Amino acid sequence: MTLKQYNTCTLEAANYADPDAYVSDLALSYIWGDGPEDSIPEDRIQQLREIHRAAAMTVPEIAKAAGLNITQMSARFAVPYRTMQDWFSGARSCSLASRLMMQECLGLYRPPID
């Protein structure tokens, strides 16, 4: 997957609550340059599932997966505690880019970029 394809797939993930619909639509997207008779590679499907899973994770889910509490998350990412509280409670939303970077830094996610 190229960086441009990854960017498109990541940004599109926010538009889909249903992971299966996301995978289906993106697997068949024009971004791959597939011909009408080409089969969809299994690794593409797996990569898309992983992108959607990572994009859908909330900050509390990221913290839980990493075994960290709110105080540890705040310190680890140098984010004010109040901001982290707002992200945990849902009072404010954390950007997709920040959530993906948190997962990368914590070893929970590795973007499938060639």
Give the location of each predicted region:
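Short intrinsically disordered terminal tails
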Residues: 1, 67, 111-114
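Short alpha-helical "recognition helix" segments of helix-turn-helix
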Residues: 62, 71-76
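Recognition helix of helix-turn-helix/homeodomain-like DNA-binding domains
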Residues: 77-94
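DNA major-groove recognition helix of helix-turn-helix/homeodomain DNA-binding modules
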Residues: 93-114
